Regions:
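Hydrophobic faces of well-ordered beta-strands that scaffold small-molecule active sites
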Residues: 12-18, 42-44, 71-75, 100-102, ...
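Active-site cofactor/substrate anionic-group-binding motifs, chiefly glycine-
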Residues: 38-78
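Structural motif
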Residues: 37, 66, 95, 169, ...
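Conserved N-terminal beta1-alpha1 strand-loop-helix module at the mouth
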Residues: 1-44
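Active-site-proximal loop/turn and secondary-structure-junction residues that shape catalytic pockets
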Residues: 16-20, 46-50, 77-79, 104-108, ...
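Active-site-adjacent beta->alpha loops and helix N-cap segments on the catalytic face
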Residues: 2-4, 23-25, 50-63, 81-87, ...
Length: 286
């Protein structure tokens, strides 16, 4: 992955949420299917919305070992102290996994806080700096450190400042939040001008009107233009899937000049939708 970015080739990374239990077959089958489509890496969230799922780093090891594909496990500051984090990084390096996305992590839901306590002894910037120091002193093969970039932030000037601070701490590449607005595209263009780092533009297909409403109103960090929302009204499942691919392709066409690759987020295991989007990106390269 690092070498392809260094050669200025557009990379394709696809995100899957890990399973919520030990039933792993569908996840592995979908991952193998997407590998066959020619993607460059799979990214794995670390217990999104602070709900326990299969550990992202352990799952990354399984994917890399069994499928031979590059992986980017996410690593939050929510659930581990610095000792546990260092131990996990040692394990990843031994397993030949050299990419990691550092994020502070979603807070523990209020209803769970009596039983589950967040750690948060450091944030994503400090974690990036810690890994950078280990890269320079300890690891035989350095990690490529990814960070998150919210191109939908209300105060994008402040978001850019945070991104520059992350770069100073060792972040070399960013995955952006999904882009579903003109504002998001404008901010992406500004980030491309100002940040000395690789940027992978976020694309998350919207698969229904209900899905669009939920993303617009309930998910922090995502903005959906009303013009996009209205296009999903009265669409059935098949029509919405076609529209999802159409809009994703158009977004990719608009962002391609400002990114070093694409960060595709799979909605509800709909890998058949992702396949069409991946094929579109590959045709652009041809």
């Amino acid at each position: 992955l690092r070498k392809k970015l260094q050669r200025k080739e557009k990379v394709i990374c696809v995100e899957f949420d890990p399973p919520m239990d030990c039933r792993i077959e569908r996840f592995m089958n979908d991952a193998e299917y997407l590998k066959e489509q020619g993607i460059d890496a799979i990214t794995i969230a670390d217990c999104p919305i602070a709900r326990a799922r299969v550990d992202s780093s352990l799952l990354a090891c399984k994917l890399h070992r069994e499928l031979g594909i590059d992986v980017i496990p996410h690593m939050t500051c929510r659930d581990r102290n610095i000792n546990a984090t260092k131990a996990l990084l040692f394990g990843l390096n031994i397993e030949d996994i050299y990419n990691v996305l550092v994020v502070t992590g979603d807070p523990i839901p209020a209803a769970d806080r009596q039983e589950v306590k967040g750690v948060f002894s450091f944030n994503s910037q400090l974690l990036a700096g810690y890994i950078r120091d280990l890269n320079e002193t300890t690891f035989p093969h350095p990690f490529l450190i990814f960070g998150a970039l919210n191109v939908n932030a209300a105060n994008f000037k402040q978001e850019l400042l945070k991104a520059k601070q992350k770069i100073q701490q060792g972040v070399q590449a960013f995955l952006t939040q999904p882009i579903h607005s003109a504002k998001g595209l404008q901010n992406l263009q500004q980030a491309h001008r100002e940040l000395d780092a690789w940027i992978l533009g976020g694309v998350m297909p919207i698969v229904s009107y209900r899905n669009a409403l939920y993303m617009k109103n309930e998910i922090a960090g995502i903005e959906v233009d009303d013009a996009i929302l209205s296009r999903y009204e009265h669409k059935n499942r098949e029509e919405a899937a076609v529209l999802a691919v159409t809009i994703a392709k158009a977004t990719i066409d608009e962002m391609v000049s400002f990114v070093d690759g694409f960060y595709l987020i799979t909605p509800f295991h709909r890998v058949e939708i992702m396949q069409q989007i991946i094929a579109h990106i590959q045709q652009m390269d041809d």
